[in-house]
């Protein structure tokens, strides 16, 4: 994803509203509950929980191929 301000706004709104997002990463589709966006050594990282397993995931934004907010 070439992250635009609109993409950041949608992601931040999903975090604030405790919404769900669908993420494509390395050919895998994941449905996540985003919790936090942070910077780690200059790299933006999404902290989220997997919807099915509840597993906490840390995904660098650079690794996300596509994302959509799920309503």
What are these regions (language model features)?
Residues 1-14:
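Mixed-charge, Lys/Arg-rich low-complexity intrinsically disordered regions
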Residues 17-25:
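A short, Trp-centered hydrophobic/proline-enriched beta-strand micro-motif
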Residues 23, 46-50:
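SH3/SH3-like beta-barrel fold
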Residues 28-29, 53-55:
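Short acidic/polar mixed-charge low-complexity motifs
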Residues 30-38:
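Short beta-strand-centered aromatic/proline hotspots
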Residues 37-43, 69-71:
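Short, conserved beta-turn/loop elements at beta-strand boundaries and strand-helix junctions
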Residues 58-71:
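Structured surface patches comprising rigid loops and adjacent beta-strands/short helices at the edges
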């Amino acid at each position: 994803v070439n992250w635009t301000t609109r993409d950041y706004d949608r992601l931040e709104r999903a975090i604030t509203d405790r919404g769900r997002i669908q993420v494509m990463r390395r050919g895998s589709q994941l449905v996540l509950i985003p919790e936090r966006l942070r910077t780690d050594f200059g790299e933006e990282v999404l902290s989220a929980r997997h919807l099915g397993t509840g597993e906490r995931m840390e995904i660098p934004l650079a690794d996300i191929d596509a994302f959509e907010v799920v309503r």
